[in-house]
Design a protein with these regions (language model features):
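Catalytic phosphate-donor-binding core of small-molecule kinases
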Residues: 1-18, 22, 30-133
Length: 133
């Protein structure tokens, strides 16, 4: 469990005690963020998604940020030395766990080659299998 607070554009949003926190782009919204209770986001969306992982309060919810928003995370408490930091599913081997992390949209875009098919057709067949016309 970790304790952290997060701010958007300098405004404190919440102090959270949870198993972790996920920040994601639209591309990652159908992965771990979705399983933690986050929404499915259209691939054209340029902002960030923030999802607390198993928070210890029912009031902690996913938050969708715009492309110009800056997310600041500050990890608190005694458990920070036991926390792991992952980037795209890969653990980052850092000498020490950072106490502050800033997330914002980069200057350059990354293009992904998709396996074909319409995004919403794929969403419908994958996540809403019982839906028939």
């Amino acid at each position: 469990m970790v304790q952290y607070k997060y701010s958007v554009n300098g405004t404190l949003i919440a102090n959270v005690q949870a198993d972790g926190i996920i920040t994601s782009t639209a591309t990652g919204s159908t992965a771990y963020a979705l399983s933690a209770g986050g929404p499915i986001i259209s691939p054209g969306y340029k902002g960030l998604l923030v999802v607390p992982v198993a928070p210890h309060t029912i009031l902690s919810r996913a938050l969708v940020l715009s492309s110009s928003d800056v997310l600041e995370l500050e990890f608190l408490g005694e458990y920070i030395h036991e926390a792991s930091l992952f980037l795209d599913g890969q653990v980052l081997n850092l000498e020490s766990t950072p106490s502050h992390i800033t997330c914002q949209r980069g200057e350059k875009e990354v293009l992904f080659a998709c396996g074909g098919g319409d995004f919403f057709q794929n969403v419908a067949s994958t996540f809403f299998q019982g839906t028939k016309e």
